[in-house]
């Protein structure tokens, strides 16, 4: 079927467009949030094709995967159709609730025509979804392969816009963690990170917006993956690191406690325990490799691509009946 969706979350979309459908990705002249089109740093198949708003009117979709309330407005404006009534629709909620948690009401809570698909059970539980039908389709990862070497006695962190997102993504924990072992931060929007948290450039390396494949290669050379995130949906970067075969040290918050089994690393709400675990893995390559193999096995079992695509096929089939 023809599936309309906006390029909102590149890593998630990379997995989604691996399916058997025709994926329509709006593109506008400015390639802004309403029309980013195809990815530039991920490899997407030809079935994920760019369409202008004008072309969409001629190439009508069978279903739309909404990811922002703005998408509802654009469907009405560009197609003259009402999502959930004239056009089958699913609202994909990427994010953990914000604001007055656990009383945060989902923007689509007061309707029943469009199901909300959460990406974690934690998110489904903590949102007030009201009368809206909900389901959970957990992440699926395009397996990058077991690339782990751990040859560098350093930790790796992947986070986008840590300066803007502040305590949400745990930037304030980096001084403590980098004292335990040198670490490298990969991601977008890293400018100002040194200044924001007083980080020592001799202990912390910054790698701003590398291509995904290159990032995976470099990340896998680090001894341990660190996930200092306090409050966000389950990061795809964490699952990718597990697929690479990296041991994990992270905060025991949101869905991480479900994703990382005990044998795959260390989760704790005590920053000092995380620093200790980083230090231990850096100084014990054999233990790090063993935990990394357990991490990869767990990720393949729970967050495999085939299961993810099958779950989405089932949901899209259900809403288009």
Question: Which ranges hold each PLM region?
Answer:
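Conserved catalytic-core segment of nucleotide-activated headgroup transferases in glycan assembly
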Residues: 126-129, 142-199, 209
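Conserved acidic donor-binding segment of nucleotide-sugar-dependent glycosyltransferases
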Residues: 262-272, 280-286
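Short alpha-helical segment that forms part of, or immediately flanks, the ligand-binding pocket
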Residues: 216, 239-243, 254-258
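Aromatic "clamp/platform" in nucleotide-sugar-dependent glycosyltransferases that forms part
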Residues: 230
């Amino acid at each position: 079927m023809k599936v309309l969706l906006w390029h909102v979350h590149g890593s998630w979309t990379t997995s989604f467009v691996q399916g058997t459908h025709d994926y329509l990705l709006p593109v506008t002249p400015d390639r802004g949030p309403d029309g980013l089109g195809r990815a530039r740093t991920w490899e997407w198949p030809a079935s994920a094709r760019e369409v202008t708003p004008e072309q969409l009117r001629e190439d009508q979709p069978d279903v739309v995967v909404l990811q922002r309330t703005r998408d509802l407005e654009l469907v009405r404006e560009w197609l003259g159709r009402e999502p959930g009534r004239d056009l089958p629709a699913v609202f994909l909620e990427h994010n953990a609730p914000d604001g007055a948690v656990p009383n945060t009401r989902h923007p689509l809570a007061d309707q029943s025509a469009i199901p909300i698909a959460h990406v974690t059970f934690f998110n489904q539980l903590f949102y007030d979804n009201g009368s809206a039908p909900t389901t959970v389709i957990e992440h699926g990862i395009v397996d990058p392969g077991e690339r782990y070497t751990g040859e560098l006695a350093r930790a790796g962190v992947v986070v986008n816009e840590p300066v803007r997102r502040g305590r949400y993504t745990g930037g304030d924990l980096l001084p403590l963690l980098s004292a335990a072992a040198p670490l490298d931060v990969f991601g977008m929007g890293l400018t100002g990170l040194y200044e924001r948290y007083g980080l020592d450039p001799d202990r912390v390396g910054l790698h701003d917006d590398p291509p995904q494949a290159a990032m995976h290669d470099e990340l896998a050379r680090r001894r341990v993956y660190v996930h200092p995130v306090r409050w966000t949906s389950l990061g795809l970067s964490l699952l990718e690191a597990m697929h690479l075969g990296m041991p994990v040290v992270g905060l025991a918050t949101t869905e991480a406690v479900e994703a990382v089994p005990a044998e795959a690393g260390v989760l704790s709400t005590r920053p000092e325990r995380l620093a200790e675990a980083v230090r231990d893995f850096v100084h014990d390559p054999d233990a790090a490799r063993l935990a990394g193999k357990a991490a990869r096995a767990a990720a393949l079992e729970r967050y495999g691509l085939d299961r993810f695509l099958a779950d989405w096929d089932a949901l899209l089939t259900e809403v288009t009946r």
